[in-house]
Amino acid sequence: MKQLFFLTLICITLSLSAQNTIQWRNDRTGIYHEKGLLTSWPTKGPQMLWHYDSLGEGHSSVAIDANKIYITGMTGNTGYLYVFDMAGKLLKKKDYGKEWDESYNGARGTVTISDSKLYIFTGTGFLICMDQNTLNILWKKDIVVDFGGKNIRWGVNESPLVIGEKVILSAGGKEHNIVALNKKDGSLIWTCAGNGDLSSYCSPLYIANQQVPQIATMMADHILGVDAATGKKLWSFKYANNRKIHPNTPIYHDNMLFCTSGYGKGAVMLRLTNGGRSVEKVWEVADLDPRTGAMVKIGNYIYGSGDNHKYWFCIDWKTGEIKYKDKSFGVGAVIANEDMLYCYSEKGEMALVKATPEKFDMISKFPIVLGTDQHWAHPVIYQGVLYVRHGNTLMAYKAK
């Protein structure tokens, strides 16, 4: 009985810990698990609780841990990490080095938080590890100098993946294509040559429930599966567009891996076989091609929007059948909570949409009137609050 009690306590503790930490798209799926959120919004939108207007340039989303909010931005050509409390009070601001200022300027990859450490991958190609409490830089790596990588057209962009003691990064070098570093000191644990592709703006995904637990990601010309323990390349699938850009983290469920990118390439569904050591194509469809907005899986359906195809789509997970196309709302990023889609248009509107394969069932929408430049940062939901970043402004809305 005592053992059962302690096991239950451990499970509860782990569950609470997971709920209290938000990384890229929550857990990289874009699916949130809040209860009691509003099912419709007032005409002018939900109540704005607070906003902060001095983030500088950038497109990164918020990360949250232990009731503190972390986000990056660029002023001049210097990147800064901002730390807020849940009421929007700025607690700390710390520079971390040069950021991307050559095109679509600003901070890019969302902060990853693990064991009191913060991991930031800059648009200039540095992986930086900071102490979560002091914000001191503990170590950093340069993908060009340390791994033979190259920067890419709009600055490298991914949110580092932490698995146990490893932090995973797409370095993009010929020899050091995907690397696993010790998250404490940055030392190299393993390296994978992959296919020698450059990186392609994709934040990698960890797939734990195969015979060979693995990392799945999209590089410039291939979708890639890598043994998480050893770095051995398990499989690759040729998948390229004319820009070599694949910014959307794949979606995995029950041996199926869904990958998509913009510039007209569309989407492909792969099946992992032989315990994850190989893949086969199940179906492919050209219409669902989000460029930076990603997609979500709810039930047996995938929801997202297009790049060349300026529609919102619903596609059957199993068959690739298109259930609807809708052009009534501008395309952009999507996240989900329960059976509702939160769609953030590149035109600067936020919509609440019922997730149903029957139609794009928009319940409410409101304009995002603060901020600067592109509407590209992905929204975040945490403890009944909807966080929206637009350039130099972070906004918090009451969603519950």
Regions found by a protein language model. Give the residues of each.
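Noncatalytic, solvent-exposed loop/strand surfaces
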Residues: A18-K400
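Short, Lys/Arg-enriched, disordered terminal segments
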Residues: M1-L4, K400
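Intrinsically disordered, low-complexity regions enriched for glutamine and histidine
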Residues: M1, S17-A18
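Sec-dependent N-terminal signal peptides
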Residues: Q3-L14
